[in-house]
Every structure is written in structure tokens, then in C-alpha cells.
Amino acid sequence: MGLGRRAMVYLGLAEEDEDYLDDDDYDDGRAVGHDDRRAMHEPVPMDRTVRRIDAREEPVAMPRRPPVEPLRPAGPVPMRRVMPVEETHPYRITTLQPRSYNEARQIGEEFRDGTPVIMNLTDMDDVDAKRLVDFAAGLIFGLRGDIEKVTNKVFLLSPHNVEVTETDKRRIREGGFYNQS
């Protein structure tokens, strides 16, 4: 029986010829001329039970395993750490009114040190003001902070661990919040 025919029989696509015995390339390990009379008289038991599967039968239910839970989350879990200002030390808000883009470093250093910054861009031309807002947006993204537009060309930059109270935000909008540093 050829390889293709054996594969078809194995997959159930063809029936095996019972009267055809393929003994090509078969070596039973006995020496030539060895006479084993018992092997010649005892039939070899073969299980040739073939069962047709009925499409109407219910599938056999496999035992279910409990769902596997990962040891750690699959991805980063965003968490915002907020220190309530009233319960900790009072924070200071720095107000900076840059006149050119060259003063961006001072804004970045104050914010990086954990100080909320009011960035007042009213004295800047629109091109430099836009560049400074872009800088602040990158700063906020990189240090996981928050930015709010207070009024036209005035922004509040809050570090990730500081929450500016609504009272202070209202004072900033009204223009009565001055540099507390």
C-alpha cells in the first residue's frame, strides 16, 4: 500500500483492503530461517472497529479549566496620584510672564520641580506664544501633568501630584493671583 493510500485510510477517506497485506520493507527482527511455529498459528488480535459519526449526536463536552488570570496587568494601568493640598503642606503657584521663547527653560524647571505654573503669554507675539504652548504641551505629556486654559493666552500647568483647588483657579481667572514664590 502506497503512502498516499495509507494517508487516505488514516484520514478515513478510503477503506483499507483487508485481503491485501503490505509487508514490503517489514523487518520483524528475527533472523532469517527462524521458525516460530506459535506465531504462525496464533492470530494477531487487531482492533478494526470503525464508528461512523452521526451529525445529530451531541459533541462530547471536554472538561473545562478555570480561567487563567495573569500575574500582572497586560499593559500599563494609568493611575493619577493626587496629594490633597489641604491635608499636606500648602503649595505655591509660580506665575511666569515670558517675553520670548528663550524663557521656556524656566517654565520647564519650575514645573519639573513640582510647582504649578501660571504661564501668562499676553506680552508675546502669536508665533512665539504658539511655540511656548507646544513646549508646555510636550512638558505636560512627558511629566504626566495637566494643562488648563485660564483665559486668552494664560495657562495653568499642574504637575501630576498636585491638584490646584477650584478656589485658586477662580482667583487665577479673576486675575488676582500673583506670584507666591
Swiss-Prot record:
One of its GO terms (cellular component) is cytoplasm. Residues 28-42 have a biased composition (Basic and acidic residues). Cell division protein that is part of the divisome complex and is recruited early to the Z-ring. Probably stimulates Z-ring formation, perhaps through the cross-linking of FtsZ protofilaments. Its function overlaps with FtsA. GO terms for biological process: division septum assembly; FtsZ-dependent cytokinesis. It comes from Frankia alni (strain DSM 45986 / CECT 9034 / ACN14a). Homodimer. Interacts with FtsZ. Belongs to the SepF family. It comes from the Bacteria. Pfam families: SepF. Residues 18-27 have a biased composition (Acidic residues). Keywords: Cell cycle, Cell division, Cytoplasm, Septation. The gene is sepF. It is found in: Cytoplasm. Disulfide bonds: none annotated. This is Cell division protein SepF. Residues 18-42 are annotated as: Disordered.
